[in-house]
């Protein structure tokens, strides 16, 4: 009799939840947009305002750093290069390490300053070192973004500083 009751109780416990469905809580993220993608399949798992145009801010520096690292990888620049700060780089606002015009730093130190301090003056100086001018570097940024399938992205500078109505990406 005890075995029958135990079997009935266990059957009840294990089957009661079968008819229930799980529902995830609505996410309340403190971000204006987001997207979550499964890396192997590319399936979008969650998105909110994923195609809304937003100011890229310092996320732009990820592309800047990618191009600098690719230039290092292909040998067009070297870790031991000395980078000279132009007037344009020294005049960048926002986050910076306050470089002065014609100030020279090792490429390695400039790169660290971009990564650690989000230094706009260093990002600009590196862009000029890689491509000759910030404008030429930004053209490379947009070409690379297209190669990566970033079809809704348009860079206007190497820093992400707000340069007017065309400075957007998503």
Feature-to-residue mapping (PLM):
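Intrinsically disordered, low-complexity sequence elements enriched in Ser/Thr/Gly/Pro
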Residues: 1-2, 37
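Active-site-adjacent loops and short helices of periplasmic peptidoglycan-processing enzymes
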Residues: 22-170
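Sec-dependent N-terminal signal peptides of Gram-positive bacterial secreted proteins and lipoproteins
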Residues: 2-24
């Amino acid at each position: 009799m005890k075995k029958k009751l135990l079997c009935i109780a266990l059957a009840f416990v294990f089957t009661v939840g079968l008819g229930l469905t799980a529902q995830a809580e609505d996410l309340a993220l403190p971000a204006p947009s987001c997207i979550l993608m499964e890396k192997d399949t590319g399936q979008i798992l969650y998105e909110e305002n994923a195609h809304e145009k937003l100011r890229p801010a310092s996320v732009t520096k990820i592309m800047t750093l990618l191009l600098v690292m690719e230039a290092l990888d292909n040998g067009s620049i070297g870790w031991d290069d000395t980078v000279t700060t132009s007037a344009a780089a020294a005049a960048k606002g926002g986050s910076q390490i306050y470089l002065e015009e014609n100030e020279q730093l090792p490429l390695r130190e400039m790169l660290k300053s971009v990564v650690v301090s989000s230094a706009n003056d260093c990002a600009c100086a590196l862009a000029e070192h890689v491509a000759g001018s910030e404008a030429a570097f930004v053209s490379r940024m947009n070409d690379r973004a297209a190669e990566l399938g970033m079809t809704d992205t348009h860079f206007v500078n190497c820093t992400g500083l707000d340069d007017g109505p065309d400075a957007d990406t998503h």
